[in-house]
Amino acid sequence: MKQNIAHIALVVNDYDEAIKFYTEKLSFTLIEDTPQSETKRWVLVAPKGSEECSLLLAKGVGEEQRSRIGNQTGGRVFLFLRTDDFWRDYRNMQQQGITFVREPKTEEYGTVAVFEDLYGNLWDLVEFKK
């Protein structure tokens, strides 16, 4: 039996501002943007070259969902962006104005730094040791 995680829902404030951030600042690919109703869209983005898992940008509806925007994991790192060249991507992200909240450091498993997305969700940029 083969299984994999296809999508991870990320609650956002606005579809278009989230698409702009992920495609322009992080250079993700917009995979799909399909209207489902007048207020709901099916929006998928993923890092270039990613084939199995993507982010489903889900607009927060109602007070409870909107209260989670930017803090879906209670202040813990939420997502992990793996790279094949840490320093290349770190410099590119700095040039794009990405805010790093923890500076790069070398760990037993590789090189890592923590950054925020446009809403404040925490991500690891990580290059694992071979």
Protein language model features and the residues they cover:
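Conserved phosphate-binding and hydrolysis motifs of nucleotide-dependent enzymes
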Residues: D14, D117-G120
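Conserved active-site tyrosine of GNAT-family acetyltransferases
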Residues: A18-T23, M93, G120
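Conserved beta-strand-loop-alpha-helix junction that forms the acyl-donor binding cleft
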Residues: V12-Y15, Q36-E38
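Helix N-cap motif at beta-to-alpha junctions
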Residues: D14-Y15, D84-W87
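Vicinal oxygen chelate
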Residues: M1-A6, T29-R82, Y90-L118, V126-K130
